[in-house]
Amino acid sequence: MRIAIIGSGIAGLASAWWLHGEHEVTLFEANDYLGGHTHTHDVQVGGRRMAVDTGFIVFNPRHYPLLTALFDELGVASQPTTMSFSMHSERSGVEYNATSLDGLFCQRRNLLSPRFWGMLADLRRFYRDAQLLLAEDQGPTLGQYLRDQRYGEAFIEEHLLPMASALWSSPTATVMDFPARYLAQFMANHQMLQMTGRSTWRVVKGGSARYVEALRARWQVRERLECPVHSVERTPWGARVHSAAGVEGFDEVILACHSDQALALLGDADAIEREVLGAIRYQPNEAVLHTDASLLPRDRKAWAAWNAHVPRDPAAPCTVSYCMNLLQGLPGDTPLVVTLNRSEAIEPAKVLRTLRYAHPVHDHAAVRAQQRWGELQGRRHTWFAGAYWGWGFHEDGIRSAHRVIDALRACEPHRLAPAFGEVAA
């Protein structure tokens, strides 16, 4: 069959990899690179040339089994990393690194702070009690749960919300609307509701784009870079893809782009597609790669892989800065930092790259829509893959592709109509 895949994030890449040996696959990508959030930049800092990631960074074999299997199949090398977390609050002046006692109490005054000890007590209580949320079908939003259980302001504003905002690249107000069960389930699955026995995380050696290079070196796929798709027109026999390259006919089309992008491409979207895809929103985020150390905690003992920042204005969202030297094991004294949504604080002369990404919003409407995955797949020769079907991470993207490929293969005997030829160039 002739199969079009629209979008080259992990869902599109994995779909193309699993199909290219059996079918004629065309991969459409609007950007000038393949990978989506797999985005590695070659930069020169301090006389050294380094590959720095600004999107997908970390994985671990236990919680990313499909991604790990793909890396093993491709011979992609990886190395262990740290997932240390720090927080600096402009409101309270509190700063800590949760990785060690020395980092936790880098501000020695916190040893005598009832507020700080209350935060730690609430942290232990949350680890224990959040397990009970896993038994609830729907349950409250995170904000409702925290209020009902009377968690302290310090725990909410100086630990849980900054951490969750960093994990999902989402504003704190959005995080408070997440289903509490959803957050607890993610944390439990990733061993984050425990003090010890957590997984070892890893990064791809030389930058995450190395796995994209490995795929491209091995597959037989028609790649359409810098070729935005304008619309997808379904017919009884397949689908026509209208792109910058013209109009082409395919037997099947896999929309491996964001849910809102997929819906925008379907001019003939039906009620089910509008309901499900329309319920999963995306949040835009600006990522800046830079060398400005002022975006990291003031005390170097508090520097961590993930550094959350709580602004003075209570209405302003938390932001996060990733120390890529720690995450990727990059050499040199100059910090290489990726900061989300705080470009105004970065010294312009120290900016290396400015990128724009988008991440799914996991509110109750989105979680309900995820349960309707099967209602969309394969109807009118159209399939939907993307990390938005899960928690929004790389493993969710590749898992969604795996589900689509399994379903597509199961119905192949019924899809015997001839493919369209090329309509226009």
Regions found by a protein language model. Name each.
Residues 2-27:
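N-terminal Rossmann-like FAD-binding beta1-loop-alpha1 element of flavoenzymes
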Residues 185-243, 248-251:
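Helical element adjacent to the flavin cofactor pocket in flavoenzyme catalytic cores
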Residues 20-44:
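Glycine-rich FAD pyrophosphate-binding loop
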Residues 42, 99-102, 316-425:
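Conserved flavin/dinucleotide-binding core of flavoenzymes
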Residues 41-67:
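N-terminal glycine-rich dinucleotide-binding loop that anchors FAD/FMN and/or NAD(P) in oxidoreductases
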Residues 61-180, 184-185:
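Mobile amphipathic helical/loop "lid" adjacent to a hydrophobic cofactor/ligand pocket
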